Swiss-Prot record:
Molecular function via GO: structural constituent of ribosome
Record protein name field: Large ribosomal subunit protein bL34
NCBIfam families linked to this entry: rpmH_bact (TIGR01030)
One GO cellular component term noted in the UniProt record for this chain: ribosome
InterPro entries (UniProt xref): Ribosomal_bL34, Ribosomal_bL34_CS
Key words, A-Z: Ribonucleoprotein, Ribosomal protein
Pfam families, A to Z: Ribosomal_L34
Family: Belongs to the bacterial ribosomal protein bL34 family.
Lineage, highest ranks first: Bacteria, Pseudomonadati, Pseudomonadota, Gammaproteobacteria, Alteromonadales
Record GO biological process: translation
């Protein structure tokens, strides 16, 4: 059986990267939430 997680740096960055987050209003909310929580890493 093929595993579900097939890593790809490009896909990872495009869907979960910092610029992808900044591109939408809700993505910016995600970053704000993670900053408020004190996350060391904000995005992938």
């Amino acid at each position: 059986m093929k595993r579900t997680f097939q890593p790809s740096v490009l896909k990872r960055k495009r869907s979960h990267g910092f610029r992808a987050r900044m591109a939408t209003k809700n993505g910016r909310k995600v970053l704000a939430r993670r900053r408020a929580r004190g996350r060391k890493v904000l995005s992938a």
